[in-house]
Amino acid sequence: MYEISPQHDFLVGIDSDGCAFDTMELKHKECFIPNTINFYGLQAVSKYAREAAEFVNLYSKSRGINRFPALVESLEWLQKRPEVKARGVTIGVPAAVKQWIAEESKLGNPTLAARVAETGDAQLKQALAWSEKVNETVAGMVRDVPPFPFLRESLDKLTGRADMLVCSATPNDALTAEWAEHGIDKYVAAICGQESGSKKETLTNAAKYPRNHTLMIGDAPGDFKAATANNCLFYPINPGEE
């Protein structure tokens, strides 16, 4: 987990997808969902698989959660669809992945790869292969997506007044590439993605600042929960009205 050395009296955590960049729809609809359909054999119910995944990742209270819990939740919703049952399609929810999620706080490919090496579990191997392919697809697809209007100006205003952290469930490599592509990585003390731990863990850095001097900017209930768990103020970004 990243440990900040405070340089200013204030700390601002910034979620990336959906807050700094308009990338949520692009990543999920063009990168995550096609790979979920392919890797989990959902071709016969692709319409409903897409609906379930879009609901979980974009349009529900689960918006913005880590990819692995989102995968499990999407499959669980899909299991319940009568249209899926009517087609005789059996949806399996990977129990080994659920167990790993329950036991691990740094839900990323490195820790999953370590568990695969330790156990050789087929469900974990499948989830790792899916996640690696998602990363590959994101790297090939996501480009030329500028920050939201006035994001740069907002960062300029915070510079010299507050320490800033990217606080995201996206892999570090993708975050670093996206922030560097547009020259805004210079504004933040660190980029803390899924390999750094959960958003709640990253925001434990708030304890180093005076009360009411810490803020999380997020677009999902999970961001709010991470903020309140660390006594941070919260600024909500309303999806669709960024």
Regions found by a protein language model. Give the residues of each.
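Active-site neighborhood of HAD-like aspartate-dependent phosphohydrolases
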Residues: 2-53, 69
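Acidic, Mg2+-coordinating phosphoryl-transfer loop and its flanking beta/alpha structural elements
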Residues: 211-242
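Substrate-recognition "cap/lid" segment bordering the active-site pocket of phosphatases
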Residues: 165-215, 229
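Short, acidic loop-to-helix structural element flanking the phosphoryl-transfer center
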Residues: 113-116, 121, 136-165, 201
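Short coil/turn segments at beta-strand junctions that form active-site/ligand-binding loops
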Residues: 8-10, 162, 211-213
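A metal-dependent, Asp-based hydrolase signature
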Residues: 58-141
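Short, surface-exposed acidic
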Residues: 40-57, 82-90, 185-189
